[in-house]
Design a protein with these regions (language model features):
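Basic nucleic-acid-binding interfaces
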Residues: 28, 61, 102
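Conserved NTP/Mg2+-binding pocket subregion across the NTase superfamily
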Residues: 96-105
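Conserved beta-strand core positions
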Residues: 34, 51-53, 81
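Short, well-ordered secondary-structure micro-motifs
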Residues: 46-47, 94-96
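Helical scaffold of the NTase/Pol beta-like nucleotidyltransferase catalytic core
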Residues: 1-34
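Metal-dependent nucleotidyltransferase catalytic core
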Residues: 9-10, 18, 57-87, 92
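Short connector loops at helix/strand junctions that flank enzyme active sites
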Residues: 29, 48-50, 76
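Catalytic metal-binding acidic patch
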Residues: 38, 43-62
Length: 105
């Protein structure tokens, strides 16, 4: 972990800790699995980096469920969030995302 990451961006450890302190997150948004990936997972985030999450829902997500989770996370972290539904990952990038993903729960 670099000083730049500590000063300018959230670390993976911080993001995971904050999420794990949300006791009803998985139940409320019907989440089966959730993982952090991207620059924050690699501890290369800056103050302008978004957060990337790989998510699998327990049910087929409605737009309301998807957007509800996205907005909740954006408010929680005060930054843009990209939610990627696991079944929608393009095969060309699936391996890279899965390899760097860090499970939330």
């Amino acid at each position: 972990m670099t000083n730049q990451t500590q000063e300018n961006g959230l670390t993976a450890e911080t993001v995971l800790q904050i999420l794990r302190e949300q006791p009803n997150l998985f139940q409320e948004y019907q989440i089966k699995t959730m993982a952090l990936f991207g620059s924050t997972a690699r501890n290369q985030a800056t103050s302008t980096s978004d957060l990337d999450f790989l998510v699998e829902f327990q049910v087929d997500p409605t737009l309301g469920l998807y957007m509800g989770l996205k907005l909740f996370l954006e408010q929680l972290f005060q930054r843009n969030v990209d939610l990627v539904i696991q079944s929608d990952i393009k095969p060309q990038i699936r391996t890279n995302i899965i390899q760097e993903a860090i499970d939330v729960a």
